[in-house]
Amino acid sequence: MTTFTNARPKTTPQRGFRASPDRPLALLARCPVHIETPMPELADLAKTLGVAQLFAKNEGKRMRLGSFKALGGAFAVAQMICEAAGVEDPVAAKETAATMTFVTASAGNHGLSVAAGAKIFGARAVIILPSTVPAAFDARIRATGAEVIGGQSYDDSVAQAIRLADENGWIHLSDGSWAGYTARPALILEGYSVLSAECAGHFAALNTWPTHVFLQAGVGGLAAGVAAHIRDHWPVQPNIVVIEPDRAPCLINSMKAGALTMGDGPDSNMGRLDCKNASLIAFEALWADADIFVTITDEAAAQAAATLAAHGLATTPSGAAGLAGLIALAPAADSRCMIVVSEGSENG
């Protein structure tokens, strides 16, 4: 385990995205399969871990897509269709949508969200899956009607998506960002603020707020989107802890360096977090919003997934990374902790 404490003075960051859920919630209000995901308290596990309380936001059934990513890619597709058509309702823009093809590389869940959004609103999607992505994602994405293309590594697949977009006049919709490419990923992070807003409503009803929030990171979108909403909207501020695979420590390396830095290493069993390059807008936001960065081993993530399964929450090492980070950090006995079970099992 490696840790990094962000001792920089916290200031209101000039974020490259909106940390407000109003627009995605307006879209979700018209979605018949949208319901707030549960956040059970795991009292027995909290006792075992030696903390006061443990809440687990369970994204495994999010809109039948199996992860928090359902909130981001589909919302971005809808917003871009609306912008292209000059309307506010994507359902009223079917003719415009039919002319649009969205292409992205994905470790699985983001591609599924983009593909589902394209299907719902009448566009076309092409998803490039790296060779390490489980076959179950290929089948689920194809079931939406999207075209799936096999790629090599994640970074190679991103480059392939950019090339195909340029060659065919398609719309590249990555959940990562870099200099000159931030507006589209910003829509995805805006969608993720819904998750944090739901948690805030839950804690307000309990009149109990966490002292620690553990957020796993690949390129950093979930961590940045949720952390930004917490900083802007929660009345009681927690310590925000960002967890990465020790085989893909792009954010912790970047925080230490003070600039975006690659996190190279062998493949991780945390497939959805196995990203070697962080998102620019996520890095910039977490620079101000996050308190602690932690890396975890593949073995720790696998054990955390088994522990959650034993408590009725089926997930993967990626989905259990927050719990693994909590166990590694071992906060004080009076800590009230929140984790995000970011995805269900790989088979849906």
Model-derived segments and spans:
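PLP-dependent amino-acid enzyme catalytic core
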Residues: 1-348
